[in-house]
Regions:
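FAD/FMN-dependent oxidoreductases across multiple families
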Residues: 1-61, 65-70
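C-terminal helical "tail/cap" subdomain of flavin- and related membrane-associated enzymes
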Residues: 66-164
Length: 164
């Protein structure tokens, strides 16, 4: 009925909401309530993307719910958060740290960081690294020499804030 009235490709209603990027919430499971995806803080802190991390959250939650329904043992629901945290917890911790650092930088400092990236490094990361695990790419991107140059850039940016 609605589609006939509105037309085949009409927008019925648009909904907008912010995406939580401060990391996973404390409890994915509360009693028999299971929280997944953006609501559970499974969007990546660096990019706010979360198709893979939230999707895997859905898979882990579904498996835990299935076990719970077969056994009626509520402890099976807790396996969901345990599995998700084992898979993504350390990466999210690193991404949260990266985000905290990057949020403090001014545009000029960020531009200098990007200018230090060589085409060779970009190609290596594009060919070999995992899009959903950014911190390994960042470490590879900077390398030892890059880390020194990056530290100088970050420090000079912070000094400018203090002095100016």
């Amino acid at each position: 009925e609605i589609l006939k009235e509105k037309g085949k490709y009409s927008t019925i209603r648009k909904i907008f909401a912010p995406i939580w990027i401060k990391g996973p919430i404390e409890k994915f499971v509360d009693g028999k309530t299971v929280i997944v995806g953006d609501a559970a803080g499974q969007a990546k802190p660096t990019t706010a993307g979360g198709i893979f991390t939230s999707g895997m959250g859905g898979v882990f939650a579904g498996q835990a719910i299935s076990k719970f329904l077969k056994t009626n043992e509520i402890s099976h629901l807790q396996e969901y958060q345990k599995r998700w945290t084992e898979r993504f917890g350390k990466e999210f911790d690193k991404q949260l740290l990266a985000r905290k650092i990057l949020e403090r930088l001014d545009n000029q400092t960020i531009n200098k960081l990007f200018e230090s990236i060589t085409p060779e490094i970009t190609n290596e990361i594009s060919e070999k690294d995992d899009f959903d695990f950014h911190t390994s790419s960042i470490i590879k991107l900077l390398g030892i020499k890059g880390s020194l140059k990056t530290a100088q850039t970050l420090i000079s940016g912070e000094f400018k804030k203090i002095l100016g």
